[in-house]
C-alpha cells in the first residue's frame, strides 16, 4: 500500500485536523468546540469521518479519503474492521510522512503502527520511545478485568512519563491523547485538538498555546436526562415513578453520554418510565458492562436492557462470552439487546428488504446472542437530511439537533419498551395468575399432521409439561389423565366442525375482524375479503385449540398457499391469512396471554415475510407476535432455524434432545443374505459348496432388490446398511433416555468426549426445568447447537441455543476438512467436473464451523482471509501451483437461513468466485470459472460483474424454493413446473457487497454448464428421505439443471460426513440405503409407531419425500415403491393399524404411492395396482367416516 497514493498538489486552505473513527459520536463535541479552537488557531478545521457509514454511502468514503489527503494532523481510532482498513489505509500510508502528526490509538495494529508524533515513530520498534512503551505495557490479553487494568495503566503512565525528559514526552503525548479521546466530552475533544496542534503544528506561533489536562469522569455511573447534572453515582438521585410496576436495568455507552449525544437513550428512558417502571440507566467506561452491573444493578432489576449494540464484555474487536454468561447467570433476569444503527441511516434501514447488513448482523446481533441475548430490536440511528420517509410516522431530523446526532426511532422504541416491560411483569407475576398460550402446528394441512413437530412426540411431551406446570402452581383445572385424552381434547370432540383439524375455541365474526385488524388492507390484498377461505365457515374466522384454565393449547394455522401452484411461483412470501393473523391477535388481546410457548420445531411465524434481521413495523413476524414474550421449545441439533426464531419472533429458545440413535441392524431377507454371504466368505476357494451358495445368495439378493453381480460390493452394502445410524422413535420431553439407549449413544460419541459427564446428564431431566425457568421470565443460559453424538457439549439441554461466532467461520479445521470433502467428491465422479451445483445450508455449516463453506472454497481454489483479530475479512486465491488442478466453477445455492445467519460468509463466497473470475494471468484450461464467465459474456452480452456472480438464494425475507410444497400438495402437473418454482424463488444472485439482484437468465446460463449437483447430509439424525428440505433444494436445482440442459440427466451426489472420514454416494444409492435402513426397517418404523398418530405422520412423510426425489431427479428405483406399498398399505394388518392411529396420514400415504404410479415413477403390475387402489379407497372412506366401524 505504501508509496503508491499520489499526494495532492497542495492542502486545502487552513489547518486541517482530521479524525477517522468508527462512528459519529465525536462529531458533535468537535463541532461545538470548533469556534473556541478557531479563536486561538485561526483557519483551523476539524472534521470527523465515520467508517461505519462508508459501505452504504460511497460519497462519505470519498470525503474521508480527500480529508486525509488534505490533512495536517490525522487522528485515527476504533478502526478494527478489515473493510474499513482496506478502504482508508492507502491514503493514510501515503500522507503519513508529510503530516505534522499521525495519532493511531485504540485501533487495529496497522493503524497504530502509523503513529508519528515528534520523536515517537511506531514504525520503528527499536527506537527509544517504542522500547519504553513495550516495557510499560507488559503483557496484556483481552478478557475479564483487562479493560479496567488498561484504563488504570492509561491514567498512570502519563504521570510517570511527565518527569522523564526528551523523547519520552512524545510517548506521554500519545497516552494523553488516548485519555482525551476515551473521556470524549466536548472539553476533552477540544483539549486533545488544542494539545496536538499546540505541540506538533508547523506554525511556530501556535507552539506556546496550552491545553487543559484530560478531565476524568466516573468509570461507572448512572445517567438520566431529567436529573440535574444528568450523571450521578447515587441511585437515590434518579427520578422514578411512584409505585413502579417493575425495575429495568439499562446499559449504555459512556462515550455517547460524555459527547452529549443521548437523544436515543433519553427516548428509551422516558418511554420506559411512561409505562410506570423504575429505571437504573447505567454506563461503564470501555466496552465491559460488568462493572456497571455489579455496582448498580445486581439484585435490583427485573430485566436487563443493553443499548450499547455490542456484546456484554467486548466490542468490535472481541467478546468474552464466558465472563458475560457468568455475570448474567448471577443476575438471572431476561437479557435484551437493542441495536443503534451505525452502518446505515434509519431511512436506509427502513427502506431495505434485508434489514441489517452483514457486519451489523454479526456484531450487533450474533455476538450478543452468544451471551444469551434475546429480542434484538433496532431503536436508533442517524437521519438522512430528508428523514425516514418510508415509515408512516415520517420522522425527520430534529432541527435543533446536530447533523450527526443519534436519533431515536419512536415506533421501534415503543415496541422495544412494550416487550421489555412485558418481560419484567412476567417475572414479577404470580404463577397462579399467569396465562400461557401454547402453540402447536399442523403442517402440511390435511395430512394428519396436527400436533406434530420434528423429532418430538408432541402430545406425550405436552402431557408431561402441562402436569409439571400444574404442579408448579399454574391454574389449569382438571387435566386429561392420559396422553390420548389430551390429544382428543385438543384435536377431537364436538367442536371439530367445518372440516377443521382441531377444536374450535373461538369464533371471530367477520365484522369484528375488520374492525380490529390494523393491517387488513395487506391481508385482503393477498387473500380476498374477510373472513377469507381458511378456518372459516364464511361468517366467522376460527381459532382452533382448547383452554385448560389459564393455559390455552392452540393450533397455529398453516401458511394458506400450500395447494395453490400460482402463489408458489411468486418470488416472495405473502401476508398471513385471516386465520393466521386472527390467531395471534386472539392470543394477545382476547386470551390475554402473558407469554407464549411454541412447542417444537417449527412453526410458520418466523418464516413470514419481513426483514431478515432488525425488523420494523411492516414485517409480519413483528406484527403478529407484537410485544408477547415467546418461549420456544426447539431441537438442540438445529441452531440455524432456532436462531431465526430468536431474531424474528422474540423467541427465548429452550433446547430438547433429538431421539436416541441406534445402528440399523439387519432384518428379514437382509439378515439371511448376510448369513449366507458369511458362510460363503468362510469357504476355501476350491470348496464344492461355493457354486450352490453363490446361487443362493444371488436368489436371496434378488428377493430384496439388491445387486449380487459383485459379491464383495454386496457384502459392503450389507455392512453399510447394518451399521447405518437411525433414530429410534421420537423424543419425549420429561422422559430421560433408557439405560440401553444411553449406552448406545455414549458408544457412538468421539473417543475424546467426556462420556461420564454425558452419561450423568442424560439420566437427568433438564428440559421441563428449562421451560419453567423461561416461563418465569428468568435468564436462560446459552449453549451452542449441535448433534449429541458429535457435540456432547450441547448437554444439558433446556438451554438457549445459539450459533457459532460468524467472525470465526470457517475455522482452520473446517477449511482442512472441507478440502478433504472436495477431494472425495472429485474422486467419486468419473471425470474432473468443470462446474458443480452445490447446495449450502446454514445448519450444517453452523454445526461444522463451516465445513461445507470450506468445501466450496476448496473446489474454487480459494481460502478465507482473516484480520489481525482472527476475524473473517474476505477471500484470497490459492495459487494454481499449490492447488494442483484447475479451479472448478461452483454454482452455490444458499438456503434462506444461511443467507440470514451467515451474511459474512455469503460475501466471502461471492468474493472468492469474483477473484477466480478476475484471474487474468491464468490459462482458461486451469480456471473453469473464468472460462465460463467469459463464455457467458460472449453469449449473453452480460457485464463481467454480473457474469461472475455465483452465489444464489431467495429474495430478502423469503425462504425455500416451494418445490417441496408443490410436491406435498400434489400441486404440479409437468415436472418442469418444479423448475419454474425453483428458478422463481432461487434466482437472486448475491454479490461481494452482500446485496442481491434477480438474475433468472444468469441462473439458467450457469446451470446449463453444470456437470453434477451435490449436497452434504446435515445431521446424523436426518436422511434425504426424512425431511422435505433436501429435495426442495438439491432436488430443485437438479430439476432446473435438467431443463437448462435440454432434458439431460444430471448426476446427483450426497456427501455423508456424519460418521468417520465421510462418504460420497450417488443419490440413488443414498435413497436405497435409507429405504432399507429406515423406511422398511421394523426397528425404525416400530419405534415411530410407539408414538401413535405422530409416528404414522412421519412414516407418511418418508413416502412423500421419496416421491419428491422421483419428481425432481428420477433417481428412485421402482422397487422402493413396491416395497413401501407391500409394507404399509397392502399388508392388511399394518394398514388397519396405521389407519386406527392416523387415518388422514395413512390415506395420504396410499394416495402418494398411487400418484407415483400415475406419474410413471414405477409401474406396478395390474394386480398390485388394483390392490393398492382398493386399499386407498378403503382408507379414504375411513378418513371421511363413511366406512362402518
From Swiss-Prot:
InterPro entries named among the record's database cross-references: CobN/Mg_chltase, Mg_chelatase_H_N
Pathway: Porphyrin-containing compound metabolism; bacteriochlorophyll biosynthesis (light-independent)
Gene Ontology molecular function terms on file: ATP binding; magnesium chelatase activity
Top-level taxon: Bacteria
Biological process per Gene Ontology, one example term: light-independent bacteriochlorophyll biosynthetic process
Reactions catalysed according to its record: protoporphyrin IX + Mg(2+) + ATP + H2O = Mg-protoporphyrin IX + ADP + phosphate + 3 H(+)
Pfam families, alphabetized: CobN-Mg_chel (PF02514), DUF3479 (PF11965)
EC code(s) of this entry: 6.6.1.1
Keywords assigned by UniProt, alphabetized: ATP-binding, Bacteriochlorophyll biosynthesis, Chlorophyll biosynthesis, Ligase, Nucleotide-binding, Photosynthesis
Function comment: Involved in bacteriochlorophyll pigment biosynthesis; introduces a magnesium ion into protoporphyrin IX to yield Mg-protoroporphyrin IX.
Family membership noted in the UniProt record: Belongs to the Mg-chelatase subunit H family.
Annotated protein name in UniProt: Magnesium-chelatase subunit H
Gene source species: Rhodobacter capsulatus (strain ATCC BAA-309 / NBRC 16581 / SB1003)
Amino acid at each position: 500500500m505504501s508509496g503508491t497514493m499520489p499526494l495532492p498538489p497542495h492542502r486545502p486552505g487552513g489547518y486541517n485536523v482530521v479524525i477517522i473513527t468508527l462512528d459519529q459520536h465525536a462529531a458533535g463535541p468537535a463541532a461545538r468546540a470548533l469556534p473556541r479552537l478557531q479563536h486561538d488557531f485561526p483557519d483551523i478545521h476539524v472534521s470527523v469521518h465515520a467508517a461505519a457509514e462508508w459501505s452504504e454511502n460511497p460519497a462519505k468514503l470519498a470525503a474521508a479519503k480527500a480529508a486525509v489527503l488534505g490533512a495536517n494532523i490525522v487522528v485515527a481510532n476504533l478502526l478494527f474492521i478489515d473493510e474499513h482498513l482496506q478502504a482508508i489505509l492507502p491514503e493514510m500510508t501515503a500522507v503519513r510522512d508529510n503530516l505534522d502528526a499521525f495519532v493511531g490509538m485504540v485501533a487495529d495494529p496497522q493503524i497504530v503502527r502509523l503513529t508519528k508524533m515528534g520523536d515517537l515513530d511506531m514504525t520503528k520498534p527499536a527506537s527509544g520511545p517504542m522500547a519504553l512503551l513495550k516495557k510499560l505495557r507488559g503483557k496484556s490479553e483481552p478478557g475479564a478485568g483487562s479493560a479496567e487494568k488498561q484504563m488504570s495503566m492509561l491514567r498512570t503512565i502519563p504521570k510517570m512519563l511527565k518527569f522523564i525528559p526528551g523523547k519520552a514526552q512524545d510517548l506521554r503525548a500519545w497516552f494523553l491523547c488516548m485519555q482525551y479521546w476515551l473521556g470524549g466530552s466536548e472539553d476533552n475533544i477540544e483539549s486533545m485538538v488544542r494539545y496536538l496542534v499546540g505541540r506538533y503544528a508547523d506554525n511556530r506561533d501556535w507552539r506556546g498555546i496550552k491545553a487543559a489536562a484530560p478531565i476524568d469522569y466516573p468509570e461507572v455511573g448512572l445517567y438520566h436526562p431529567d436529573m440535574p447534572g444528568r450523571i450521578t453515582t447515587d441511585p437515590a438521585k434518579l427520578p422514578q415513578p411512584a409505585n413502579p410496576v417493575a425495575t429495568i436495568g439499562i446499559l449504555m455507552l459512556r462515550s455517547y453520554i460524555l459527547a452529549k449525544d443521548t437523544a436515543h437513550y433519553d427516548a428509551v428512558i422516558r418511554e420506559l418510565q411512561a409505562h410506570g417502571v423504575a429505571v437504573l440507566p447505567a454506563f461503564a467506561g470501555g466496552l465491559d458492562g460488568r462493572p456497571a452491573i455489579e455496582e448498580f444493578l445486581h439484585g435490583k432489576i427485573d430485566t436487563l436492557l443493553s443499548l450499547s449494540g455490542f456484546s456484554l464484555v467486548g466490542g468490535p474487536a472481541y467478546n468474552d462470552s464466558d465472563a458475560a454468561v457468568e455475570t448474567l447467570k448471577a443476575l438471572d433476569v431476561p437479557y435484551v439487546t437493542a441495536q443503534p444503527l451505525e452502518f446505515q441511516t434509519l431511512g436506509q434501514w427502513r427502506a431495505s428488504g434485508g434489514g441489517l447488513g452483514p457486519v451489523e448482523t454479526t456484531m450487533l446481533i450474533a455476538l450478543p446472542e452468544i451471551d444469551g441475548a434475546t429480542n434484538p430490536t433496532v431503536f436508533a440511528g442517524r437521519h438522512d437530511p430528508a428523514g425516514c420517509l418510508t415509515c408512516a410516522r415520517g420522522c425527520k431530523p430534529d432541527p435543533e439537533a446536530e447533523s450527526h446526532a443519534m436519533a431515536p426511532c419512536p415506533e421501534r422504541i415503543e415496541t422495544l419498551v412494550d416487550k421489555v416491560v412485558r418481560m419484567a411483569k412476567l417475572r414479577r407475576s404470580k404463577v397462579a395468575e399467569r396465562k400461557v398460550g401454547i402453540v402447536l402446528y399442523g403442517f402440511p394441512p390435511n395430512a394428519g399432521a396436527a400436533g406434530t413437530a420434528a423429532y418430538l412426540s408432541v402430545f406425550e411431551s405436552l402431557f408431561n409439561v402441562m402436569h409439571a406446570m400444574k404442579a408448579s402452581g399454574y391454574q389449569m383445572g382438571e387435566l386429561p389423565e392420559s396422553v390420548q385424552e389430551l390429544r382428543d381434547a385438543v384435536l377431537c370432540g364436538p367442536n371439530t366442525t367445518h372440516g377443521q383439524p382441531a377444536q374450535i375455541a373461538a369464533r371471530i365474526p367477520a365484522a369484528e375482524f375488520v374492525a380490529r385488524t390494523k393491517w387488513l388492507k395487506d391481508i385482503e390484498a393477498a387473500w380476498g375479503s374477510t373472513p377469507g377461505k381458511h378456518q372459516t365457515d364464511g361468517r366467522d374466522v376460527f381459532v382452533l385449540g382448547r383452554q385448560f384454565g389459564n393455559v390455552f393449547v392452540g393450533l397455529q394455522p398453516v401458511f394458506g398457499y400450500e395447494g395453490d401452484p400460482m402463489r408458489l411461483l411468486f418470488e416472495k412470501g405473502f401476508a398471513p391469512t385471516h386465520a393466521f393473523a386472527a390467531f395471534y391477535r386472539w392470543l394477545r388481546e382476547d386470551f390475554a396471554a402473558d407469554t407464549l410457548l411454541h412447542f417444537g420445531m417449527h412453526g410458520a411465524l418466523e418464516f413470514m415475510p419481513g426483514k431478515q434481521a432488525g425488523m420494523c413495523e411492516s414485517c409480519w413476524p413483528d406484527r403478529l407476535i407484537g410485544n408477547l414474550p415467546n418461549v420456544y421449545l426447539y431441537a438442540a441439533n438445529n441452531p440455524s432455524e432456532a436462531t431465526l426464531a430468536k431474531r424474528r419472533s422474540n423467541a427465548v429458545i429452550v433446547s430438547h434432545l433429538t431421539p436416541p440413535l441406534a445402528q440399523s441392524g439387519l432384518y428379514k431377507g437382509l439378515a439371511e443374505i448376510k448369513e449366507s454371504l458369511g458362510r460363503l466368505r468362510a469357504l476355501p476357494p476350491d470348496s464344492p459348496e461355493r457354486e450352490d451358495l453363490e446361487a443362493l445368495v444371488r436368489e436371496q439378493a434378488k428377493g430384496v432388490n439388491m445387486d449380487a453381480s459383485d459379491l464383495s460390493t454386496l457384502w459392503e452394502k450389507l455392512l453399510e446398511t447394518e451399521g447405518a445410524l437411525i433414530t429410534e422413535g421420537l423424543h419425549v420431553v420429561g422422559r430421560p433416555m433408557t439405560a440401553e439407549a444411553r449406552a448406545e449413544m455414549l458408544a457412538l460419541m468421539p473417543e475424546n468426549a467426556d462420556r461420564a459427564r454425558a452419561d450423568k446428564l442424560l439420566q437427568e431431566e433438564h428440559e421441563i426445568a428449562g421451560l419453567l425457568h423461561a416461563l418465569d421470565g428468568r435468564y436462560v443460559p446459552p449453549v451452542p447447537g449441535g448433534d449429541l453424538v458429535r457435540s456432547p457439549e450441547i448437554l444439558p439441554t433446556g438451554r438457549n441455543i445459539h450459533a457459532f461466532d460468524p467472525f470465526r467461520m470457517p475455522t482452520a479445521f473446517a477449511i482442512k476438512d472441507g478440502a478433504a470433502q472436495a477431494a472425495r467428491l472429485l474422486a467419486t465422479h468419473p471425470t474432473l467436473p468443470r462446474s458443480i451445483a452445490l447446495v449450502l445450508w446454514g445448519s450444517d455449516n453452523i454445526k461444522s464451523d463451516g465445513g461445507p463453506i470450506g468445501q466450496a472454497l476448496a473446489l474454487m481454489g480459494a481460502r478465507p482471509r482473516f484480520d489481525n483479530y482472527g476475524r473473517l475479512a474476505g477471500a484470497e486465491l490459492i495459487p494454481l501451483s499449490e492447488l494442483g488442478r484447475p479451479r472448478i466453477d461452483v454454482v452455490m445455492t444458499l438456503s434462506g437461513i444461511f443467507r440470514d445467519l451467515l451474511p459474512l460468509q455469503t460475501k466471502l463466497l461471492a468474493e472468492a468466485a469474483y477473484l477466480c473470475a478476475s484471474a487474468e494471468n491464468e490459462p482458461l484450461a486451469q480456471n473453469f470459472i473464468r472460462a465460463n464467465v467469459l463464455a457467458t459474456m460472449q453469449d449473453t452480452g452480460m457485464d463481467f460483474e454480473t457474469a461472475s456472480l455465483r452465489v444464489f438464494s431467495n429474495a430478502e425475507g423469503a425462504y425455500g424454493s416451494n418445490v417441496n410444497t408443490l410436491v406435498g400438495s400434489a400441486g404440479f402437473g409437468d415436472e418442469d413446473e418444479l423448475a419454474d418454482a425453483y428458478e422463481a424463488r432461487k434466482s437472486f444472485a448475491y454479490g461481494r457487497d452482500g446485496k442481491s439482484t434477480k438474475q433468472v437468465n444468469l441462473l439458467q446460463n450457469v446451470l446449463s454448464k453444470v456437470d453434477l449437483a451435490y449436497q452434504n447430509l446435515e445431521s446424523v439424525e436426518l436422511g434425504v428421505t426424512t425431511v422435505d428440505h433436501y429435495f426442495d433444494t438439491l432436488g430443485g436445482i437438479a430439476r432446473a439443471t435438467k431443463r437448462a440442459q435440454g432434458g439431460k440427466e444430471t448426476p446427483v451426489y450426497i456427501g455423508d460426513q456424519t460418521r468417520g472420514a465421510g462418504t460420497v454416494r450417488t443419490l440413488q444409492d443414498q435413497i436405497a440405503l435409507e429405504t432399507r435402513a429406515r423406511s422398511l426397517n421394523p426397528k425404525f418404523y416400530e419405534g415411530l409407531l410407539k408414538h401413535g398418530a405422530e409416528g404414522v405422520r412421519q412414516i407418511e412423510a418418508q413416502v412423500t419425500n421419496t416421491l419428491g426425489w422421483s419428481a425432481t431427479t428420477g433417481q428412485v428405483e421402482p422397487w422402493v415403491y413396491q416395497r413401501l406399498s407391500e409394507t404399509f398399505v397392502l399388508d392388511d394388518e399394518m394398514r388397519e393399524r396405521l389407519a386406527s392411529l392416523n387415518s388422514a396420514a395413512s390415506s395420504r400415504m396410499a394416495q402418494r404411492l398411487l400418484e407415483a404410479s400415475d406419474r410413471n415413477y414405477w409401474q406396478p403390475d395390474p394386480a398390485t395396482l388394483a390392490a393398492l387402489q382398493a386399499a386407498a379407497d378403503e382408507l379414504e372412506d375411513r378418513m371421511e367416516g363413511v366406512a362402518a366401524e
